[in-house]
Design a protein with these regions (language model features):
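Intrinsic, low-complexity N-terminal interaction/targeting segments
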Residues: 177-180
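Basic/aromatic DNA-contact patch characteristic of tyrosine site-specific recombinases
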Residues: 1-61, 68-69, 85
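N-terminal core-binding DNA-recognition domain of tyrosine recombinases/integrases
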Residues: 60-75, 84-174
């Protein structure tokens, strides 16, 4: 079975279609992931709402975006809101929860952000992001996980990607880096 993920715009939302096909190429299932982000003005302050495809505010995001990082620069808050939208889109695609993430899923998330294909069954997307953008997304995740007090989350572990690299990824670039 293969899984393909395609991205499309719906208004100002970025959505994903996840299609699973059998070995013969017949579609087994097709689902849409659309995590929406809205900004509203409340007493002269910008507040962010992040909600799922059922139009329910995603637990934890309101407090993080509107209280925890309230004193950050407006552009930083907006970037972090977009980062959380990407994170929850990925969570919907792989059908897991944030507190169940493994090192392998973190690596898949990095590839998802880059828009690159892996040797796994998830096809690539068309968006390519540079390393500074990826690092900003990962920093947002670490801060958000810390805010949520997720004890078993491997997001907070400070481990080299050489160690976290799962078997479906090539380790050659990292081996070359070590041997220099």
């Amino acid at each position: 079975m293969t899984t393909s993920v395609s991205e499309f715009k719906e208004g100002n939302a970025t959505c994903f279609v996840v299609e699973e096909k059998d070995e013969a190429g017949k579609t087994i299932s097709k689902r849409e992931i659309c995590i929406r982000l809205r900004s509203i003005q409340v007493q002269g302050q910008t507040r962010y709402l992040l909600y799922d495809e059922n139009m329910k505010v995603i637990p934890g995001t309101w407090g993080y975006l509107n209280d925890h990082i309230a004193l950050k620069a407006p552009n930083t808050r907006k970037q972090r809101a977009y980062s959380l939208r990407q994170l929850y889109s990925f969570i919907g695609i792989i059908r897991t929860s944030l507190d169940q993430f493994t090192a392998s899923e973190i690596m898949q998330y990095r590839q998802f952000l880059k828009g690159l294909n892996t040797k796994s069954s998830i096809d690539s997307r068309t968006i390519l992001r540079d390393n500074s953008t990826i690092n900003m997304h990962l920093e947002t995740m670490r801060d958000y996980v810390s805010y949520l007090h997720l004890e078993n989350s491997c997001f907070r572990e400070s481990v080299s990607s050489r160690i976290l690299l799962p078997s479906e990824y090539s380790a050659e670039p990292f081996e070359k880096e070590v041997s220099k």
